[in-house]
Amino acid sequence: MCLAVPMKITRIDGFAATCEAKGIAREVSLFMLQGEPLDVGDHVLIHVGYAIQKVSEDEARSAWELFDEILEHA
């Protein structure tokens, strides 16, 4: 099973980006989404350092709400 974490793009430099979620920033590769138009402020799913899918802000928020609920009951 794979887990992808939704993050918001805060900086783009070619195929590299800085993404943020829950106060944590990470450098990620946009290489796998090179055919997708991406801008600062967009949300993407991150898996092992790669953005693998663009998602809406609502989808990202829903995922984090689910993660928070799971952690609350862990």
Give the ranges of each region predicted by the language model.
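Conserved hydrophobic positions within beta-strands
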Residues: 6-9
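C-terminal structural segments of small proteins and small subunits
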Residues: 43-74
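Beta-strand/loop nucleic-acid-binding surfaces
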Residues: 25-35
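SH3/SH3-like beta-barrel fold
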Residues: 17-21
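Short nucleic-acid-contacting surface segments enriched for D/E, G, S/T with interspersed K/R
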Residues: 34-45
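Anionic group-transfer/hydrolysis microenvironments
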Residues: 22, 31, 49
